[in-house]
Curated annotation (Swiss-Prot):
Listed name of the protein: tRNA pseudouridine synthase A
EC number: 5.4.99.12
Binding site for substrate: Y110
Enzyme class: isomerase
Gene: truA
Keywords: Isomerase, tRNA processing
Source species taxonomy: Bacteria, Pseudomonadati, Pseudomonadota, Alphaproteobacteria, Hyphomonadales
Function in brief: Formation of pseudouridine at positions 38, 39 and 40 in the anticodon stem and loop of transfer RNAs.
Gene3D superfamilies per record: Pseudouridine synthase I, catalytic domain, C-terminal subdomain (3.30.70.660), Pseudouridine synthase I, catalytic domain, N-terminal subdomain (3.30.70.580)
An annotated Gene Ontology molecular function: RNA binding
Family: Belongs to the tRNA pseudouridine synthase TruA family.
Active site: D52 (nucleophile)
């Protein structure tokens, strides 16, 4: 059967995460229901990133196998059957049968958005974390560089994480301020459960002035989950892009 690669965006607010769960509304479940209507039978949709409840995506990638062999129609047909879900298939391409959205990926890129102001959120409600106290973005960026590279991220590993190893390689963790908007950009081949939100929550503690810059390295080297700062809420996290080998 033809295999299709999907580029997907969604507002994760209404969903209990990506993964299909009996009796709960999930992104994978909504996509599989739409694909079943398109293809006339059960379809498994496999995603590159298994985002948590409330986490959004602007560049999630998934694959599925269909009996339908109409590449130019798949995206429009999926979007028709997805209504009124806040999920959109931006693109659908035929790919080789050995392409796997999760296991073929070589990098994943996340962005976390903080709105640093006292006033409550309006347009960004549900799409950012509002932090009313003034944050020092330069100190957060400096502290973040302690996390770049290959490390044991036990401190930032959720207790529910099922990964075999806490060792991961961050290739980028930048923090930048744009007026009252602060963006955390994080890239790695793969992540452990809630790693990005754990990192952001700890960096915000530095930004608030509750800990010095050197604290970031200290808690990393401690390899102790109890040393992690508060986990940032899911609202501000976006899976922005997934990379694959050229060709």
């Amino acid at each position: 059967m033809p295999r299709y690669r999907l580029l997907i965006e969604y507002n994760g607010g209404p969903y209990q995460g990506w993964m299909r769960l009996p009796g709960l509304q999930t992104v994978q479940g909504a996509l599989e229901a739409a694909a079943a209507q398109l293809d006339g039978g059960p379809v498994e949709v496999t995603g590159a990133g298994r985002t948590d409840a409330g986490v959004h995506a602007t560049g999630q990638v998934a694959h599925m196998d269909l009996r339908v062999d109409r590449p130019n129609k798949v995206a429009d047909a999926m979007n028709y059957h997805l209504r009124p879900h806040p999920i959109a298939v931006l693109k659908a391409d035929r790919v080789e049968e050995d392409f796997h959205a999760r296991f073929s990926a070589i990098a994943r890129h996340y962005r976390y958005i903080v709105i640093n102001r006292r006033a409550h959120l309006t347009h960004d409600q549900g799409l950012a974390w509002r932090v009313p106290s003034r944050l020092d973005a330069d100190k957060m960026h400096e502290a973040a560089q302690s996390f770049v590279g290959t490390h044991d991220f036990t401190t930032f590993r959720d207790s529910e994480c099922q990964a075999l190893s806490p060792v991961k390689t961050l290739t980028r963790l930048d923090v930048a301020r744009y007026n009252d908007r602060i963006e955390f950009t994080c890239s790695a081949p793969s992540f452990i459960h809630r790693q990005v939100r754990s990192l952001v929550g700890s960096l915000v503690e530095v930004g608030r002035g509750r800990h010095p810059v050197k604290w970031a390295r200290e808690i990393l080297e401690a390899a102790d989950r109890t040393r992690c700062g508060p986990v940032a809420p899911s609202d501000g996290l976006f899976l922005e892009r997934v990379d694959y080998p050229a060709g």
